Amino acid sequence: MSRLALTPLLVILLAACAHEPGRNPIAEWVPSPNHDVRDPIIVVIHATEQASVEESLDTLRTRNSGGPVSAHYLVGDDGRIYQLVPDALRAWHAGGGRWGTITDLNSASIGIELDNDGREPFTDVQVDSLLVLLEDLAERHGIPRTAVIAHADMAPTRKRDPGHHFPWATLAAAGFGQWPAGPLVEPPAGFDPWMALRLVGYSLEDRTPHDERAAAARAFHRHFRGIDDGDDPAATLDAEDARILYGLVQ
């Protein structure tokens, strides 16, 4: 069966919710009050790092003085898709950070939470549903298929999710996210991997402190190599990273 084929549950939801404006018919509507208006041009992938989808739904739908959070979608480990905030509104999921020229990710993005405790691999059915959702968002909003990033990519000093278990290669095979094109080759003499990392989208400047560069390297390793460096303050870019980065920017 194709990874992008609609499951029976999604077909049922499509038929049942087609008349509801502002709501995605492939998701179950469980509204959160934590949002305001914005226009999506990118997708940010999160992991809930909580014990259950019920706990995550409660967190994402509760007003609290400690800092209310939400996301547009939550995908359960059973593949069920919940929509909490309409696509046209601004959910509060990204926090501070930057990706390329985008400095307000909440205003620019669709936030997708995945039910995952941060330690276990993501389920196949969950990834299948995510791919269906990404295809839908790309078609309806014109979001570039490459504009799918990790929460940790845009906030590497604060966040690790969705973590090193997330199958970015599977998303790339379906045409989503950035991924090297073709076999990796040695970059030419003078190739600057840190400049390439910046061109990919990571927030780096000439005077970026060492700890922030290390955090960006750790985020890159989780995303493109499936490696968890923990909080290693000495994390840096090696020869394999340079080959990957050359494949991304050439």
Sequence positions of predicted segments:
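C-terminal motif of bacterial Sec signal peptides marking the signal peptidase cleavage site
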Residues: L14-A16
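Cell-envelope/ECM-targeting effectors and their regulatory/trafficking segments
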Residues: A18-E20, V127-G142, R158-Q250
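Bacterial N-terminal signal peptides that target proteins for export
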Residues: M1-L6
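Active-site-adjacent loop/helix surface patches within enzyme catalytic domains
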Residues: E20-D36, I41-I42, E49-T146
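Acidic/histidine-rich, metal-coordinating catalytic segments
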Residues: I143-R158
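Short, well-ordered, mixed-charge alpha-helical segments that flank or form enzyme active sites
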Residues: R119-P121, P156-K159
